[in-house]
Amino acid sequence: MRFQKNYIITGEILCRTGLHIGVSKDSIEIGGSDNPIIRDPVTRLPYIPGSSIKGKMRSLLELELDRVSNGGPCKCGKCEICRVFGSAADSSSSSGPTRTDSSSSSGPTRIIVRDAFPTDETVEEWKESSEVVEGAELKYENNLNRITSMANPRNQERVPRGSKFGFEIIVSEYDGDSDNLRIVLEGLRLLEDSYLGGSGTRGYGKIEFKNIKIRERPVEYYRGEAGESTMGDFESLADINTTAE
């Protein structure tokens, strides 16, 4: 199996609604949030883990292609999802389709999803807003007892709508591969019509991929024998057609 090229997909993730990607709370703070969001430990600003993006894309594609069994991810090692997103080495689990032949492994994972960090423009907007603290707003909600109507108020931190994060996805192509880039773009489209993070059915987590650039770097690029080529600059995923893919 020989490496052929990488596709570099870059752009911005625009939060159309508030975004909540939670983190475990190790301490209780006076006036703190009941449900904090994940933050960069250095800057104390929110970011979007690459694992959150990749995991959501994979789960949506598995549902679309009927590759889910017993609630677990596909582990067959043969299908296009296993090829692009990788398959677990342990095939003994009963959750999800499993590989039946150890020689059927599809090789290295073809996708790398980097952590997405807020753009400089967004950081400045956060600083100027009196309602945003360390990149987050507090959303107050109530849980009502159906019998007594007693309210149980709580709050959640979330990244405010309109925030932008820079993203980068690398899609590799090896001998015999033909549609890795198409599968990744399909996963991104599915994600736009779903949600990222928690509380998505209550309006959180609607995102859009904007200002997308796709570059192609053949193996010769890494040997210093050739340059990269730009496949296109696109305002949105809707502008990327089959020919571009």
Swiss-Prot record:
It holds the Pfam family RAMPs. It comes from the Archaea. Keywords: Antiviral defense, Endonuclease, Hydrolase, Nuclease, RNA-binding. The keyword Translocase does not apply. GO terms for biological process: defense response to virus. It is an enzyme of class 3 (hydrolase). CDD domains: Csm3_III-A. Residues 88-110 are annotated as: Disordered. One of its GO terms (molecular function) is RNA binding. InterPro entries: CRISPR-assoc_RAMP_Csm3 (IPR013412), CRISPR_Csm3_endoribonuclease (IPR052216), RAMP_III_fam (IPR005537). Its EC number is 3.1.-.-. Belongs to the CRISPR-associated Csm3 family. CRISPR (clustered regularly interspaced short palindromic repeat) is an adaptive immune system that provides protection against mobile genetic elements (viruses, transposable elements and conjugative plasmids). CRISPR clusters contain spacers, sequences complementary to antecedent mobile elements, and target invading nucleic acids. CRISPR clusters are transcribed and processed into CRISPR RNA (crRNA). This subunit has the target ssRNA endonuclease activity; it cleaves multiple sites in the target RNA at 6 nucleotide intervals. PANTHER family: CRISPR SYSTEM CMS ENDORIBONUCLEASE CSM3 (PTHR35579:SF3). Part of the Csm effector complex that includes Cas10, Csm2, Csm3, Csm4 and Csm5. Encoded in a type III-A CRISPR locus. This is CRISPR system Cms endoribonuclease Csm3. The lineage of its organism: Archaea, Methanobacteriati, Methanobacteriota, Methanomada group, Methanobacteria.
